[in-house]
């Protein structure tokens, strides 16, 4: 008798019910994964490839013997759909569930642990029964900052992805508040989508897509059209967007190692100009991409001639200074400081590098470090009035900061003192009450002693 037959013949075993009445949810329709819904979920959406899912489950062998349960650990089990993190049956079965749904799954060995099993709890060629509750699911956080959430409707082909500078052909459909505002086929260069009214979030997502992949992208304002919005499409400032994107084809750009020094220097001049255009247009993320290319091409370039070395240093210095300015605009002050450090490594007395590092440190409340940088600016250029003003601002901000700290600590100490006084008062009251009770006991004791002789008479 096979394990599957055993499931059918086990009276009172829910696995038997699934074996007889379950829906085949496999694409091959080979009855490898059977499902019965025990509690209907809500909504219409089900998990997609790459989604993070949160489930509770009980796992049993077909004979009813339990081998695992998330309930025993008092925490949900979390995995990503379609990434091979769980048995095939789960990737298939859980993908059919709605949020809040509870179902029973019966899984044949080829969709579970196969001939190998998972000893000691799961023997070879075991059919498994699961009760699964889908608690929640979320799209894939592509950049791990919540700004781009991907939900994959269709897998792509192969393992190659477009890189920055790749030429891509895509179909896109953009929605905002339920309204379709853009729908078209378009070809463009990754990192330059803005030139075609495509938000930077699409560029970023394309670098993680495969050919023929179809996905839904939820873009936060930072990766959409930002504070400016997009009047052309009727998009308000700081709007959240939803795009459905299909990557039809792409041709990768040359990697750094495929380019010689001459080509890198020629391309550096081109992308520097592109970066400046984006910066002047307030497209700081796009500008970062362009300036970043210069760094990736030239920072680790060795064996240059004197002329090439001079040109390379000039491009790198400009790139680091411009990146620092972009990061200041993007309020990424730590990155701004790092870029200034790189620039000052090339030119320790660079006025812009010192000034921008001072700006970043002032905004990070590093007042002494900022003041030191502005003082160095004056050593380089005593006529820099902005640096003098910034030194005054450092002193003013430091004083205000210290005053706030003083008030904060004073209030803290006052509260501690009041709390200590209250505790001392409570102790004194408790002691007084205790002494009163003791005195009453002593008085009562003396009264009893005095009454004793009268009792005997």
From Swiss-Prot:
GO BP terms in the entry? chaperone-mediated protein folding; response to bacterium
Query: Subcellular localization, per the record?
Result: Cytoplasm; Nucleus
Which Pfam families has this protein been placed in?
Answer: FKBP_C (PF00254), TPR_1 (PF00515), TPR_8 (PF13181)
Task: Give all N6-acetyllysine modified positions.
Answer: 28
**Bias-annotated ranges (Basic and acidic residues):** 447-457
Its cellular-component GO annotations read: cytosol; nucleoplasm
Domain called PPIase FKBP-type: residue spans: 50-138, 165-251
Q: Where are the TPR repeats?
A: 268-301, 317-350, 351-384
UniProt modified residues of type Phosphoserine: 445
Enzyme kind, highest EC tier: isomerase
Which positions bear N-acetylmethionine? 1
- Record keywords, A-Z: Acetylation, Chaperone, Cytoplasm, Isomerase, Nucleus, Phosphoprotein, Repeat, Rotamase, TPR repeat, Ubl conjugation
The subunit structure is: Part of a heteromultimeric cytoplasmic complex with HSP90AA1, HSPA1A/HSPA1B and steroid receptors. Upon ligand binding dissociates from the complex and FKBP4 takes its place. Interacts with functionally mature heterooligomeric progesterone receptor complexes along with HSP90 and TEBP. Interacts with NR3C1. Interacts with Akt/AKT1 and PHLPP1; enhancing dephosphorylation and subsequent activation of Akt/AKT1. Interacts with IFI44L; this interaction modulates the kinase activity of IKBKB and IKBKE. Interacts with IKBKB and IKBKE.
Which purpose does this protein serve, as stated in its record?
A: Immunophilin protein with PPIase and co-chaperone activities. Component of unligated steroid receptors heterocomplexes through interaction with heat-shock protein 90 (HSP90). Plays a role in the intracellular trafficking of heterooligomeric forms of steroid hormone receptors maintaining the complex into the cytoplasm when unliganded. Acts as a regulator of Akt/AKT1 activity by promoting the interaction between Akt/AKT1 and PHLPP1, thereby enhancing dephosphorylation and subsequent activation of Akt/AKT1.
Miscellaneous section: The relative resistance of squirrel monkeys to glucocorticoids is associated with a high level of expression of FKBP5, but is also due to intrinsic differences between the human and the monkey proteins. Human FKBP5 has a much lower effect on glucocorticoid sensitivity.
What is the recorded name of this protein? Peptidyl-prolyl cis-trans isomerase FKBP5
């Amino acid at each position: 008798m096979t394990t599957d037959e055993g499931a059918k013949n086990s009276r009172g075993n829910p696995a038997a019910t699934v074996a007889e009445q379950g829906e085949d949810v496999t694409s091959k329709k080979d009855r490898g994964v059977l499902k019965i819904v025990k509690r209907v979920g809500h909504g219409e959406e089900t998990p997609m490839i790459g989604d993070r899912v949160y489930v509770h489950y009980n796992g049993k062998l077909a004979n009813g013997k339990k081998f695992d349960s998330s309930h025993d650990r008092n925490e949900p089990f979390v995995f990503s759909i379609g990434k091979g993190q769980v048995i095939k049956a789960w990737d298939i079965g859980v993908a059919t569930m709605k949020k809040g749904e509870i179902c029973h799954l019966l899984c044949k060995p080829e969709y579970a642990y196969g001939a190998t099993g998972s000893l000691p709890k799961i023997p070879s060629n075991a059919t498994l029964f699961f009760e699964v509750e889908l608690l929640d699911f979320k799209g894939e956080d592509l950049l791990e900052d919540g700004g781009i959430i991907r939900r994959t409707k269709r897998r792509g082909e192969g393992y190659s992805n477009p890189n920055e500078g790749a030429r891509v052909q895509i179909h896109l459909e953009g929605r905002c508040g339920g309204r379709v505002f853009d729908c078209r086929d378009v070809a463009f260069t990754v990192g330059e989508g803005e030139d075609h009214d495509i938000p930077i979030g699409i560029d970023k997502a394309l670098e993680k897509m495969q050919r023929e992949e179809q996905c839904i992208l939820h873009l936060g304002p930072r990766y959409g059209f930002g504070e400016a919005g997009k009047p052309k499409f009727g998009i308000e400032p700081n709007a959240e967007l939803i795009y459905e994107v299909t990557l039809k084809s792409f041709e990768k750009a040359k990697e750094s190692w495929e380019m010689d020094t001459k080509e890198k220097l020629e391309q550096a001049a081109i992308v520097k100009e592109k970066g400046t255009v984006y910066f002047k247009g307030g497209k700081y993320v796009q500008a970062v991409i362009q300036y970043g290319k210069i760094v990736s091409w030239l920072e680790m370039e060795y064996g240059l001639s004197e002329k090439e070395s001079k040109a390379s240093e000039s491009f790198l210095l400009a790139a680091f200074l411009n990146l620092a300015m972009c990061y200041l605009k993007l309020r990424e002050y730590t990155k701004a400081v790092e870029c200034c450090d790189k620039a000052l490594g090339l030119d320790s007395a660079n006025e812009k590098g010192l000034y921008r590092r001072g700006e970043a440190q002032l905004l990070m409340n590093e007042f002494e470090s900022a003041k030191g940088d502005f003082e160095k600016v004056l050593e380089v250029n005593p006529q820099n009035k902005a640096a003098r003003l910034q030194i005054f601002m450092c002193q003013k901000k430091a004083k205000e900061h210290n005053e706030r700290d003083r008030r904060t600590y004073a209030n803290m100490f006052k509260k501690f003192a009041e709390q200590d006084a209250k505790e001392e008062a409570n102790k004194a009251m408790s002691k007084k009450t205790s002494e009163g009770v003791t005195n009453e006991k002593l008085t009562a004791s003396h009264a009893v002693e005095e009454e004793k002789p009268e009792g005997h008479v």
